[in-house]
Amino acid sequence: MIYVIDCTDKAGHLQTRLDNREAHLSYLAGFDGQLIMAGPFLSATGDMIGSMLIMDFETLQDAELFCANDPYQLAGLFSGVAIRPWRKTLPA
């Protein structure tokens, strides 16, 4: 099942994101076969303010475990994380 993971950073925590970025990217590299795409949400001024990941997991519990162990989550970066099952429709 494909999941969209929508993460919102806590306000004023850009430095937390920057300090943990390499660990986060290394963590994602361990999910090469499951990671479809990922990237940051940006503010109007171009600062990173959240993350969106599209990933393939067997179960919602697998997606939750992935999120719980993300270095950004462990560093306390996120004010919220939403995990939503998703089905690609277009383009066909």
Where are the predicted features?
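Conserved, structured core segments of small domains
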Residues: 1-92
